[in-house]
Amino acid sequence: MLKIRSLGHSTFFLDDGTHRLLIEPFLEGNPRCPVTLGEVQSWQPSAVLISHAHGDHWGNALDFGRAGVPIIATAEIAGYAGAHGANNAVGMNIGGTYRAEWGSVSLTPAWHSSSFPDGTYGGMPTGLVIEFGGQRLYFAGDTALFSDMRLIGDRELDLAFLPIGDHYTMGPEEAGRTLDLLRPRVAIPMHYATFPALTGDPAVFRTEGERRGVEVRVLDPGETTEL
């Protein structure tokens, strides 16, 4: 059984009963995060996964990395983390797969941008295909719709995390079109309602999923679902 807990915005905590993953550690400064940094640290994640370097995704990465938790991301993000005291960072690139005791993560393309809050270049933005808890998950990161999502869908996805906020990423209608390409069993919307510009409505995305026979689960911050 895989438990997935929303921590607001695009931040999720995954627990398969043995190992735990933190995706996009945007905790402090996240107006939708229902827990403290200290609480999440006490959950002892096995790894931190980051799709790109923008502050609302990079977040508190160094608080975990400096404590020895591996940060898994692009080579540029891992290099930045290592230069700032996160000595176990794992640098990858698009097309590569990192394997660990808990499972694996592969980097895919994403159509967006990537730089750290201080302006340092963060490499290419990515999506993540995660094998964890007996499930295959696609975390799209921040992205627009792109046709090669069909190739990601060929991996037979159990779950897709998709941004729907619009303005900086695709909105709910475009995210609905990705379901035709990705063909996941379940989809979870993310990256909406955190800031005024992110106006995408999860109810619209749910309707898009219903039209395509995809189960959409809308998680409030702090809410948990299971696969």
Curated annotation (Swiss-Prot):
Transmembrane segments: none annotated. GO terms for molecular function: hydrolase activity. Gene3D superfamilies: Ribonuclease Z/Hydroxyacylglutathione hydrolase-like. It comes from the Bacteria. InterPro entries: Metallo-B-lactamas, RibonucZ/Hydroxyglut_hydro, UPF0173, UPF0173_UPF0282_UlaG_hydrolase. Keywords: Hydrolase. NCBIfam families: PRK00685.1. PANTHER family: UPF0173 METAL-DEPENDENT HYDROLASE MJ1163 (PTHR43546:SF3), UPF0173 METAL-DEPENDENT HYDROLASE MJ1163-RELATED (PTHR43546). Belongs to the UPF0173 family. This is UPF0173 metal-dependent hydrolase DR_0006. It comes from Deinococcus radiodurans (strain ATCC 13939 / DSM 20539 / JCM 16871 / CCUG 27074 / LMG 4051 / NBRC 15346 / NCIMB 9279 / VKM B-1422 / R1).
